[in-house]
Amino acid sequence: MSWLEKILEKSNLVSSRKASIPEGVWTKCTSCEQVLYHAELERNLEVCPKCNHHMRMKARRRLETFLDEGNRVELGTELEPQDKLKFKDSKRYKERISAAQKSSGEKDALIVMQGELLGMPLVACAFEFSFMGGSMGSVVGARFVKAVEAAIENNCALVCFSASGGARMQEALMSLMQMAKTSAALERLSEKGLPFISVLTDPTMGGVSASLAMLGDINIGEPKALIGFAGRRVIEQTVREDLPEGFQRSEFLLEHGAIDMIVDRREMRQRVGGLIAKMTNHKSPLVVSVNESPNEEPYSVPEVDEKG
């Protein structure tokens, strides 16, 4: 065997070993570009263990990891999108729906589940961004209303994880109508004295941010989530001014009072559970106090000398 044949044999052996590694074992962080073991990333709830970058998460997995195991019931599964306008751009709307259902594995862009969080009854919903950019159409609006109705019926809180590009253009005015429809439903929830916690994840834009996503009794942002209405370039072209760096990130919004807090995804169950327990006066042994300093003495109103 010549020296050239030996080299070729070794290279073939190495390439065959590489080919034996199945796809999906490794992935790369979209922020620090660190190569990560996919199973480890899943265990860490799609948060990079190297730089803590919060990657986009599937809606179904988000709800399954957020709610307690067992007793989870999905709502609104009978609702499916329809092409009532026979809309066509570069593709027919029907074709876009079929492609999105095939790629995402979901019927539409919102999943609603009823279950428990740390032993407390809860209704939770999450947007699936891989389904047409998490856009809000008639089915999304109808499912969200079902979530509100279920929360009212069970006298419990509602939590929504938003990840959307906004209203679905293929449904025209019917998609814009969902902004008013979901807002009106939340007003009914508020009248019953039940809390709505909105968790804004990356990205939350357009008609969703301009309606239900910003109507929470408490608005929570994930770290470095993109949150806004129009994109940076559109705004700059409209106002003809340069905008500050990161002005649509959750940290900037928290600093300027647009959201109430930023919570790491890995702490979301306990933080949201603690908030709901406080807001509903629910006693649960699984809930850890949301107070950062539980040993701190409670604040007392100072007495005022009325004579002086």
Curated annotation (Swiss-Prot):
Coiled-coil region: none
Cofactors demanded by this protein: Zn(2+)
Spell out the residue ranges making up region: Disordered: 288-308
Looking up HAMAP family in the UniProt record yields: AcetylCoA_CT_beta
Q: Kindly give the PANTHER family that the UniProt entry links to this protein.
A: ACETYL-COENZYME A CARBOXYLASE CARBOXYL TRANSFERASE SUBUNIT BETA, CHLOROPLASTIC (PTHR42995:SF5)
Which family is this protein grouped under?
Belongs to the AccD/PCCB family.
- Please give the name of this protein: Acetyl-coenzyme A carboxylase carboxyl transferase subunit beta 1
Source organism per entry reads Vibrio parahaemolyticus serotype O3:K6 (strain RIMD 2210633)
